[in-house]
């Protein structure tokens, strides 16, 4: 695995303040189906949980994504990765995401929220014409039912709520990013899920 490093010392104080403000705004008023995970010690390491959109093969899943800001941000776009393993035409084997917003359509005034919403939209409308996963792109165009079944199966295996942290490491490849800094957040989320399930079980037992 390649070494991971931070560009936080290379960003201007103004950019750091701007990014942190946007992250805090999203934390207090999250976009629908998106939960941002703030790493206050390194604003260049941005992670979020995205709910699989209804009506798609990803609907039952929660997907962890990572944005890595370059030292020239916002003049140059960040790199985006799925940390949760996913079968999608526009996601490479190491999780890297291919979307025009982060390539030719990038503008410095586009914020983190816009990027995360674009990634969520990519789950609804994949673009097989610019596929990083050629198998998924070809399958989507020629055998959609098979594509949908494969994507749904991968979602059920890797993108379940209890795996939103543990499953992240499954998507790491040689060039994939690390998730260690957010391990504490993962544990809190999983503990809440377990507590909720326990309460539901107790309620069901009382009804018997």
Curated annotation (Swiss-Prot):
Active-site residues per Swiss-Prot or TrEMBL entry: 98
InterPro entries in the cross-refs: Ub_conjugating_enzyme, UBQ-conjugat_E2_core, UBQ-conjugating_AS, UBQ-conjugating_enzyme/RWD
Comp. bias regions, Basic and acidic residues: 170-196
Reactions catalysed according to its record: S-ubiquitinyl-[E1 ubiquitin-activating enzyme]-L-cysteine + [E2 ubiquitin-conjugating enzyme]-L-cysteine = [E1 ubiquitin-activating enzyme]-L-cysteine + S-ubiquitinyl-[E2 ubiquitin-conjugating enzyme]-L-cysteine
Transmembrane segments: none
EC class (word): transferase
Keywords: ATP-binding, Cell cycle, Cell division, Nucleotide-binding, Transferase, Ubl conjugation pathway
EC number per UniProt: 2.3.2.23
Keyword rRNA processing attached: no
Any one Gene Ontology molecular-function term assigned to this protein's record: ubiquitin conjugating enzyme activity
Domain UBC core stretches: 14-160
One protein family per Pfam: UQ_con
Region (Disordered): 161-196
Keyword ATP-binding annotated: yes
Pathway membership, UniProt: Protein modification; protein ubiquitination
Coiled coil: none
An individual GO BP term: anaphase-promoting complex-dependent catabolic process
Similarity section: Belongs to the ubiquitin-conjugating enzyme family.
Function, as annotated: Catalyzes the covalent attachment of ubiquitin to other proteins. Acts as an essential factor of the anaphase promoting complex/cyclosome (APC/C), a cell cycle-regulated ubiquitin ligase that controls progression through mitosis. Acts by specifically elongating polyubiquitin chains initiated by the E2 enzyme vih/UbcH10 on APC/C substrates, enhancing the degradation of APC/C substrates by the proteasome and promoting mitotic exit.
PANTHER family for this protein: UBIQUITIN-CONJUGATING ENZYME E2
Protein name from the UniProt record: Ubiquitin-conjugating enzyme E2 S
Organism: Drosophila grimshawi (Hawaiian fruit fly)
């Amino acid at each position: 695995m390649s070494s991971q490093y931070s560009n936080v010392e290379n960003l201007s104080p103004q950019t750091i303040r701007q990014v942190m403000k946007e992250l805090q705004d999203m934390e207090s008023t999250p976009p629908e189906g998106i939960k941002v995970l703030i790493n206050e010690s390194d604003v260049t390491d941005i992670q979020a949980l995205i709910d699989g959109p209804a009506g798609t093969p990803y609907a039952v899943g929660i997907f962890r994504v990572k944005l890595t800001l370059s030292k020239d941000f916002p003049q140059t776009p960040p790199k985006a990765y799925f940390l949760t393993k996913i079968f999608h035409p526009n996601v490479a084997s190491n999780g890297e995401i291919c979307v025009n917003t982060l390539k030719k359509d990038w503008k410095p005034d586009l914020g983190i929220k816009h990027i995360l919403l674009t990634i969520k939209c990519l789950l609804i409308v994949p673009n097989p014409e610019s596929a990083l996963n050629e198998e998924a792109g070809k399958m989507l165009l020629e055998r959609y039912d098979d594509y949908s079944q494969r994507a749904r199966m991968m979602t059920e295996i890797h993108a379940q709520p209890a795996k939103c942290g543990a499953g992240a490491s499954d998507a790491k490849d040689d060039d994939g990013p690390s998730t260690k800094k957010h391990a504490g957040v993962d544990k809190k989320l999983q503990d809440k899920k377990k507590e909720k399930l326990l309460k539901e079980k107790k309620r069901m037992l009382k009804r018997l």
